[in-house]
Amino acid sequence: RFQTIIHGDAKLANFCVNAREAQVAMVDYQYVGRGCGIQDVAYFLSSALSPDNCATREEEALSIYFTALEAAIMRHQPTLNATEVVEEWQRLYCWAWADFVRFLAGWAPHHYKIDRYSLQLTEDVLRLLEKREKQL
């Protein structure tokens, strides 16, 4: 329901960081488009954290992100209900990660990022799909 402009390839290699000035820029906009911002977040975390850290730091990383997102929405888009956006994107995180796994499975089926954490999130999504199918 809540969409934004997404980068589409938000891996760590596409970020330029000036730590001294606390500035960040992104490059390589070949996949830019409209979508759910949590897609970029999931892809960024997959490239910035090791597989083990994805599992152990997920809650912390997402908490930092969603706190900043909520503040940014309230400042720049005050007519939006920031809580609704955050709640929707929180629910969609596992879907975004499962989509990343789908991409990896087609591109590099033995990629090291197709690990226990990635497979667990994908299984969670598959269970949600089965549950929805039974409700139809």
Predicted regions: what is each one?
Residues 1-7, 16-19, 127:
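ATP-dependent phospho-/nucleotidyl transfer catalytic cores
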Residues 90-136:
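ATP/Mg2+ or Mg2+-diphosphate-binding catalytic cores
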